[in-house]
Amino acid sequence: MKRWLTLFVCSLAMACTAAALDREAFTVTRYQLDVQIDRASHVMAVTGQLTLRNDSKSPQKYATLQVSSSLSWNGIVLDRTPVEWIGNNYTSDIDHTGGLSEAIVTLPKDVPPGGTVNLDVQYGGTVTPDSTRLTRMGAPAEMALRNDWDQISEPFTAMRGLGYVAWYPVSLPAVSMSDGNAVFDAIGAWQFRQQRTEFDARIHVISGDAKLCIVGNATTSSCGEMGGTENPRTGGRVGQITNSIHLNGLGQTIPTFSVADYVQLEHSGATLFHTPEKISLARDYAAAAEANESVLHEWLNPAVQVPTVIELTDPNTSPYQNGAVLFTPLRQSETPTLSLLLLPVQVAARFPSPHRWIEDGLQRFLQVVSVERRSRRKGALQFLDEYLAPLVKAEESASAEPGSAAKSTDSHAADDTLLNTSDEILLRGKGSFVFWMLRDMMGDEALQHALATYRPGADLNPAYFQNLLQEGKKRDLEWFFDDWVYRNRGLPDFRVENAYVRPLLGDPSKIVLVTVTVENRGNAGAEVPVVIQTPSGERVVRVLVRAHQKASGRSQVPAPPTKVVVNDGSVPEINSGDNTFEIPASPAP
């Protein structure tokens, strides 16, 4: 009975400690990891040192370290002395397993604010296909595994970091994918804290007789170095391939690597790592990358790094882009389709930015421009509008949240803006609409000039890009950036209130003047195209309509119009159901 009581008291103390933890108190300022991978047994074994800095305002007695729930902590040491730590299973969807293996470390003495501590760590386990976090939400298993494809195996070894597999230690509060954007927001907040973190990981993979290659988004050599090591199963010597990942900051780059019998194909548009049997497909991808060079040359400065494509040897996996590196299966497809797939990674190689909305939005915007070259404006807008439905849904969900009725007020509009969101729908979808609307308002030349003069190191305030666009122009864009970038005021909601048709007196050509009044019932303003349709063609007039206001546009047309349509799809709006205004035919004289 006494022993049971002692255990109960200890467990209660552990629970109280865990509940009182500040899991975001410490920032890992440096990772120095040595990673051993045995593909045959799916095993990863990691040793290394972490430098932790207390970024909270209070002294800290406890530090938390989390890795994937498929990995286990084996030891934690401070100054060559093992420290006390408690293992804890922690449910969180930042890992594909839907859980984390957490170590709650008791430090010998409090670490003051700004103080640092070096911990030597040892952990390991297996990494196998797991999509628990998706399937428990009802996602079909096959579809879930296409997205959560990370694993260690002889046929296929590839791993992404935080947000997929926590193969390096992190510390975040518990988050669930069922809670809106909570997972993305938590990861974004962690990345913000780790912007200056140094990351070094030396990766060793037992290769046996196979010719393997380790490549990733920050590997220091093209394919790795061959060597030998002891076989963990037989004790004899066995081949080993080694490569390193080095990053100066984890703010936007997620440490990712893949292992296969890769060969390298260097091309003007991109460098490809592919398996030997995929040489024909690799050449198709290289040709598709080259096909993008004209649009890239027209819109952007030369590349500051080489765009890289790494084959995922499992054909059922979904592509994954991180910066200027694309991990993707090589599949047979038409050149235009491949070009669209490759264009974002090529843009990333030419145009880095500290703002994700600029990076992601520009990548998709140039995809739209590429589609326009083949399919004109109508085809481009159809491609652009593929993000419209999820964007509208995201805005409706935000408006439905408790306390969000006054979305247009500053307190709510400052939430989830393009400057602070981690939502891919906003970053890539809304971001691409912003670039397209700016192009429609300013023209190609002005936007291209702003992109050419953009310097990521000089982008130190939110208005930097706006100022580049306004440079030498008489146009004020403050209202636009305030509605679409600095604030999240939602979307416009246009309708044609009236169209007034008047013949020009004494004009033998029978030209008529059309005045169209447009109302915007939404919370964001926009300059929107108004299409005036006549039996002999159509005329477009652009009208700037601020939120909850009306504005008019005028145009002369050669014949009485039959219909007026506000918005051709270039401006995302909450409801396009009443954008058309039918004009009754004038009675015969």
Tell what function each PLM region has.
Residues G75-V77, A210-V215, C223, L477, ...:
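Beta-strand-rich binding/interaction modules
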Residues D120-Q252:
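Extended, low-hydrophobicity, Ser/Thr/Pro/Gly-biased non-transmembrane segments
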